[in-house]
Amino acid sequence: MSQNIRVVITGMGALSPIGNDVKTTWENALKGVNGIDKITRIDTEPYSVHLAGELKNFNIEDHIDKKEARRMDRFTQYAIVAAREAVKDAQLDINENTADRIGVWIGSGIGGMETFEIAHKQLMDKGPRRVSPFFVPMLIPDMATGQVSIDLGAKGPNGATVTACATGTNSIGEAFKIVQRGDADAMITGGTEAPITHMAIAGFSASRALSTNDDIETACRPFQEGRDGFVMGEGAGILVIESLESAQARGANIYAEIVGYGTTGDAYHITAPAPEGEGGSRAMQAAMDDAGIEPKDVQYLNAHGTSTPVGDLNEVKAIKNTFGEAAKHLKVSSTKSMTGHLLGATGGIEAIFSALSIKDSKVAPTIHAVTPDPECDLDIVPNEAQDLDITYAMSNSLGFGGHNAVLVFKKFEA
């Protein structure tokens, strides 16, 4: 167990397929709102995939100057909007006296895919001189962190983690450790992604990762029979985390405490999880060891649960192997059933869900739960939110490349 500085969550910001802020996103999650619909951003006629979780009624020019927005890929735009909400929510004052002790650590799994597509077309059609000088700064995944730090003036530890679908959770975990060891007083952290593009849809389709089901009510159905892949989503989930001393000194509202972080590698396959979910199991155990708790102490687990045939089953096996008899009493829901899979942003959104579950004593459901897979026989909180007094919550993220990341959150007690 870490005997270091206590770290708490004091601010949250979200853009998701079920809401353009934290309040709306959480309310809709508890209502079981389905954010998945037909893709509008691109013409999907040539593709086998036609559904995604897109943002609704969102205009970037309501948040960022048009000229500046044109110099950022969507994933960076989303990060700035969510980070501003989180900092405002935390009432965090970033000024010349505090800036050096406030850092930014925001990840993106694939970075500026739309920017790449546009630049490639310019190169092929008109030659190298027509490629924008902003191409590289718009493309690279670390630019969400860079632009957020510039926008907010945060000059502390600054970096970006890229671990595919585990990116958001790894980012929060690394930021947690930065604060825990005293290298910063506060960190703005999470994940962001804008993957609804021609190349991303084509690429993930080619790897057979995406659902080809055109029924919005059954395309994303984690832990159910007949599931055939994940549904892409977009957005950003950003937290302000800080030392308990800093939070208490300024009278900040505290949502929950972060007490554990575990991360492992499968060393098995570029896309498939290790047999029996072995790597994920080790990450869950590492996170509990870091928190100094046992399986029986955890009441809720926000699962990775992407709705892939192999992934869901392996995660269930990993949970059973890790929790043993305690798995029978554990609430396990996949909020991706509502949002779709936001890739690098998903860990940020699901950290928000986990913390708010603790704060509000409510667990968001796994919707579309109508044909349970008998091998995925956990309590997945089917279709309707449940009231639950939670002391400890866990959030899992598992990514291509064998990346496994797990966070443990605790109800705050002074």
UniProtKB/Swiss-Prot annotation:
**EC code:** 2.3.1.179
Q: One Pfam family name from the record?
A: Ketoacyl-synt_C
What is the active site of this protein?
165 (for beta-ketoacyl synthase activity), 304 (for beta-ketoacyl synthase activity), 341 (for beta-ketoacyl synthase activity)
Keyword set includes tRNA-binding: no
Q: Which residues form a coiled coil?
A: none
Task: Enumerate the UniProt keywords alphabetically.
Answer: Acyltransferase, Fatty acid biosynthesis, Fatty acid metabolism, Lipid biosynthesis, Lipid metabolism, Transferase
What transmembrane ranges does the database entry give?
none
Q: Which Gene3D superfamilies match?
A: 3.40.47.10
**Domain Ketosynthase family 3 (KS3): start-end pairs:** 4-411
From the UniProt record, list the reaction(s) this protein catalyses.
Answer: a fatty acyl-[ACP] + malonyl-[ACP] + H(+) = a 3-oxoacyl-[ACP] + holo-[ACP] + CO2; (9Z)-hexadecenoyl-[ACP] + malonyl-[ACP] + H(+) = 3-oxo-(11Z)-octadecenoyl-[ACP] + holo-[ACP] + CO2
What is one GO biological process annotated to this record?
A: fatty acid biosynthetic process
- Alphabetical list of PROSITE patterns matching this protein: KS3_1 (PS00606), KS3_2 (PS52004)
Q: In which pathway does it act?
A: Lipid metabolism; fatty acid biosynthesis
**Which GO cellular component terms are attached?**
cytosol
Q: Which GO terms describe its molecular function?
A: 3-oxoacyl-[acyl-carrier-protein] synthase activity
- UniProt KW Transferase keyword: yes
What is this protein's function per UniProt? Involved in the type II fatty acid elongation cycle. Catalyzes the elongation of a wide range of acyl-ACP by the addition of two carbons from malonyl-ACP to an acyl acceptor. Can efficiently catalyze the conversion of palmitoleoyl-ACP (cis-hexadec-9-enoyl-ACP) to cis-vaccenoyl-ACP (cis-octadec-11-enoyl-ACP), an essential step in the thermal regulation of fatty acid composition.
Q: Which family does it belong to?
A: Belongs to the thiolase-like superfamily. Beta-ketoacyl-ACP synthases family.
This protein's name: 3-oxoacyl-[acyl-carrier-protein] synthase 2
Organism, per UniProt? Staphylococcus aureus (strain MRSA252)
Organism ancestry: Bacteria, Bacillati, Bacillota, Bacilli, Bacillales
